[in-house]
A protein has these predicted regions:
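Juxtamembrane/disordered regions of integral membrane proteins
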Residues: 1-113, 117-138
Length: 138
């Protein structure tokens, strides 16, 4: 059980750190220019916390630890990329379909970002999961 907790924490930490840098620094002007008219002055912290607590569960379940963590690194990273692509495409394409003025270029950038972010976060989770599993065998 501890290896799953370690995988979750590893996934969560990488997800949080990298996404906060992306959202807070790198892509902030991109989002402000593209959807600034829709953005709240302050983020809804409970909703953000819920996302960051729930999303790693999906990455753990589908990419880091299916079949008790037996996936290879390449299979883990591919599964994480597919999971991220589908999750972010669902969000962005739904917004593109239903919200007036949602920028097409921003949707595609965000889908690519979600794919990359999910892959990196799962790498952190797999490293923590595998390391903890190896320690348990000692």
């Amino acid at each position: 059980m501890i290896k799953y907790a370690a995988g979750y924490v590893g996934t969560l930490l990488v997800l949080l750190v990298i996404d906060l840098i992306w959202l807070g620094v790198i892509a902030k002007p991109l989002y402000s220019n593209g959807i600034g008219h829709l953005m709240a002055e302050q983020p809804n912290l409970w909703a953000a916390a819920a996302f960051y607590l729930i999303y790693p569960i999906g990455l753990i379940y589908f990419s880091v630890a299916p079949r008790n963590g037996a996936l290879s690194w390449s299979d883990t990273l591919l599964a994480a990329a597919v999971f991220g692509f589908i999750a972010y495409a669902t969000y962005d394409l739904s917004n593109l379909a239903t919200l007036k003025g949602w920028p097409t270029h921003l949707a595609f950038i965000d889908i690519v970002w979600g794919t990359v972010l999910s892959t990196l976060a799962a790498a952190g989770g797999k490293a923590a999961f595998d390391w903890t599993a190896a320690q348990a065998l000692r």
